A protein has these predicted regions:
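Glycine-rich, proline-tolerant flexible connector loops at the mouths of alpha/beta enzymes
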Residues: 1-18, 36-42, 65-76, 99-100, ...
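Alpha-helix-loop-beta-strand connector modules within alpha/beta enzyme cores
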Residues: 8-33, 80-96, 137-154, 198-210
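Structured functional modules or segments
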Residues: 469-547
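Catalytic cores of alpha/beta
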Residues: 106-111, 160-175
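Hydrophobic faces of well-ordered beta-strands that scaffold small-molecule active sites
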Residues: 1, 28-35, 65-66, 91-95, ...
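Terminal or standalone catalytic/regulatory effector modules within metabolic enzymes
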Residues: 1-6, 237-240, 251-460
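Active-site mouth loops of central-metabolism enzymes
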Residues: 33-49, 68-71, 94-107, 153-161
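Conserved, mostly hydrophobic/aromatic
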Residues: 67, 123, 174, 197, ...
């Protein structure tokens, strides 16, 4: 999410960020989370792209790679692990912990042995949803320590309130390392507080040796920084016990809150949380960690908002069912799988075995786009090329506007204290992506209205608004096809006057970081197309009309 957020919202080059951090912390190993064959994107990449990405991360200052696969398909870890080892860096193989009828302690032990056999230097238990219970943690760590010889590290989120107790039981069982966050940046969607864990272990055989007074200096430094970015946190104030049932990780929870708000459907949160376990079961009890958390989450939102389960199936959900992401822990729903396979067979081999080397092709595409758009590249072209390879549309948009801060989200205002009075009612002008918006805010800080503005701050004319949001005029003839979600038009797959049959893909919509294929519900002729590629659309807005 860090890489994505840098180019999507901040207008910041993530490669520069790595270099700058390494520059001020030359003695401290820099660690990154790498999604195996997914890298940082939302699909599988060819082996040559994976190897080149690892090369560049090492070149820019990363030396510890926590490598995992969202499906826990160990085959998807191998290329990234091999390349990390080849470059002399630390490869930490990871199991994505989850709870389901098919996930047993023996399954985790078998995965750990596979990771050790790959040559990984250490093992991480990644408890992204905070589902690891303290006594289960003790038994799991105890058995893993007996099964493998490499060091074991625990990464547990605090969202459910279990993490600190689980950390202590893991320590008692012999865990080698645990992840924590400095106190002022800890808990809720994050991790247990470093200060607290250090204090708990102070008089034990596993005393850390860390100085609480020095930790307090760090704590104090980050306190106002957390306040500065508080608007981007979720609504959670204590613990969220719903996660013990829905198994939604904290990062996914905040993401879903924001996404539902963007869809004007914040009131549907509980319905979506209830739908998530059902979708997860249909998709073979896959763990909920990026990118599968987004895949399951987006599909759940679609099922709720459209009023019909799987009326619209995202490209990524179909990919899970087809085997494009690897093997699932349990069998997927057969009827749903048959619907997306359309008579073909699911993939059973390592998915990347079916992907031809693509680095050269990506470079040719990239060079063509750069030349057409007149984009100025970074000093090291390969950094920009990899940004494009992982995030084609967002990456090019970032590269085009790298020197235009108005295109991206404005930086939040610095605040001196977390104690703020309720926001006053008022009207404000905000600039984003080169456009101005007039925003009306109620007492308490809720946005009640947002309209595009002209350069002088007045509400924009209709013609100005059409540059920002696609034309909403609905033709009177035929059946209008509306957008199931708010998002951006990625591709228009048909032309005006084209004949289509039931099931044909009409438009690909990028919404909630996923690609959603909008298909024809019946055959006919496209009589009007109301949008073009790159347009922003809202829920229900007419995309095209079929007669």
């Amino acid at each position: 999410a860090t890489f994505d957020s840098c180019i999507r919202y901040l207008g910041e080059d993530p490669w520069d960020r790595i270099r700058e951090i390494k520059k001020v912390m030359p003695k401290t190993p820099q660690q990154m989370l790498l999604r195996g064959q997914n890298l940082l994107g939302y699909r599988h990449y060819s082996d040559d792209v994976v190897r080149k990405f690892v090369d560049q991360c090492v070149e820019n200052g990363v030396s510890v790679f926590r490598i995992f696969d969202a499906m826990n398909d160990m085959r998807n870890l191998k290329t990234a692990t091999d390349q990390t080892i080849k470059l002399g860096q630390h490869a930490q193989g990871t199991i994505s912990y989850t709870v389901s009828p098919v996930h047993t302690t023996q399954m985790w032990i078998d995965m750990a042995k596979e990771i050790e056999d790959m040559g990984a230097h250490s093992l991480c238990i990644k408890d992204m949803a905070g589902l690891l219970q303290p006594y289960v943690a003790y038994d799991l760590v105890k058995q893993l320590k007996e099964a493998v010889d490499i060091p074991i590290q625990l990464h547990a989120h605090a969202t459910t309130g279990l993490s600190t107790a689980s950390i202590i039981k893991a320590v008692e069982a012999g865990i080698d390392r645990v992840d924590t966050s400095i106190g002022s940046m800890s808990m809720t969607y994050g991790h247990s507080a470093t200060n607290s864990v250090v204090s708990i272990l102070e008089n034990s055989p596993r005393k850390t040796g860390l100085d609480l007074e020095k930790l307090e200096e760090i704590d104090a430094y980050f306190r106002p920084i957390r306040c500065k970015y508080a608007q981007f946190e979720g609504s959670l104030k204590g613990v969220d016990s719903r996660i013990l049932l829905s198994q939604v990780p904290g990062g996914m929870l905040t993401n879903m809150e924001n996404q539902l708000r963007e869809q004007n459907a914040a009131d549907k949160m509980d319905e979506v949380l209830a739908e998530i376990p059902r979708v997860r079961k249909d998709l073979g009890y896959i763990p909920l960690v990026t990118p599968t958390s987004q895949i399951v989450g987006t599909q759940s939102v679609l099922n709720v908002l459209t009023g019909e389960r799987y009326k619209t199936i995202t490209k990524e959900s179909a990919g899970i069912l087809k085997g494009e992401y690897g093997s699932t822990p349990a069998p997927v729903d057969k009827a749903l799988q048959a619907k997306v396979l359309e008579g073909s067979h699911p993939i059973t081999c390592r998915p990347a075995d079916n992907i031809a080397p693509e680095m050269h092709i990506l470079e040719q595409e990239f060079d063509t786009i750069v030349a057409e758009k007149g984009i100025t590249l970074a000093k090291n072209k390969i950094d920009d090329l990899l940004t494009y390879a992982l995030f084609p549309q967002v990456g090019i948009s970032f590269l085009e506007n790298r020197d235009n801060p108005d295109f991206f989200e404005p930086a939040p205002q610095v605040v001196d204290t977390c104690a703020k009075p309720d926001s006053e009612e008022g009207t404000y002008t905000v600039s984003f992506k080169g456009a101005s918006y007039t925003v009306e805010v109620s007492a308490g800080g809720n946005v009640t209205s947002m309209k595009a503005s002209s350069d002088d701050g007045a509400p924009a004319s209709a013609s100005t608004e059409k540059e920002i949001v696609a034309d909403e005029v609905t033709p009177t003839e035929g059946e209008a096809i509306g957008a199931p979600l708010s998002g951006n038009i990625w591709k228009v797959m048909v032309e005006s006057h084209q004949k289509v049959v039931e099931g044909d893909v009409l438009v690909i919509l990028e919404a909630m970081k996923m690609e959603t294929e909008i298909r024809a519900a019946k055959g006919g002729v496209v009589v009007d197309i109301s949008i073009k590629e790159g347009d922003s659309v809202t829920v229900g807005q007419t995309l095209l009309t079929i007669a």
